[in-house]
Swiss-Prot record:
Cofactor(s) needed for function: a divalent metal cation
Pfam family of the protein (one): Maf
Protein name per UniProt: dTTP/UTP pyrophosphatase
Top-level taxon of origin: Bacteria
SUPFAM superfamilies, alphabetized: ITPase-like
Subcellular location: Cytoplasm
Disulfide bond annotation, renumbered to this chain: none
InterPro entries: ITPase-like_fam, Maf-like
Main location: cytoplasm
Keyword tRNA-binding: no
A Gene Ontology molecular function term of the record: UTP diphosphatase activity
Entry EC no(s): 3.6.1.9
Residues with site note (Important for substrate specificity): R12, T73, Q155
Source organism phylogeny: Bacteria, Pseudomonadati, Pseudomonadota, Gammaproteobacteria, Pseudomonadales
Amino acid sequence: MPSLYLASGSPRRRELLTQIGVPFTVLSTQIDETPFDLETPAAYVERLALGKAQAGLAALPADQQACVLGADTAVVLDGRILGKPVDQADALAMLAALSGREHQVLTAVALTDRQRSETCVVTSRVRFRPIQPHEAHAYWTSGEPADKAGGYAIQGLAAIFVAGLHGSYSAVVGLPLCETAELLSRFGIPCWQCLEGDKS
């Protein structure tokens, strides 16, 4: 069985991959995340997920039997990608734009080894209730929005803003577990290898 590497610094992706009982090692990768002109959000997240996985594989010894998993998430409103806020004003503007509306969250997963690469993109729809200005300010003060796509974390304090979700909750957090498990199985990596409470 090949060794699995996660090409992501995201603690949320580490937690999600651990949740399905797959042993892995974290790889630190850096790629250019600038969108291409006229690139669709789906093509963007797929390109970045694959780029992270390929960069991770390139950092490993050439004779090592390994699979590398990469992922990328984008929050999309009216066809526009909302990245990580650059400052308080940017974060408050994002929350105001998302307030009382439905938006899309696209997460791409890529898995690559020495022979092949496979990807998938999962689209979910999230609906926010109206967010009051004082709530947006308090949320920014918490520090949570600073490094989050779209300026919020559905699994954190921003859960109180979520009036509805259609799609994959784990994908909105950062890694669609159903689709990730399917990809892993196609590369010969089963889930549930590390089960909590397993005494064997």
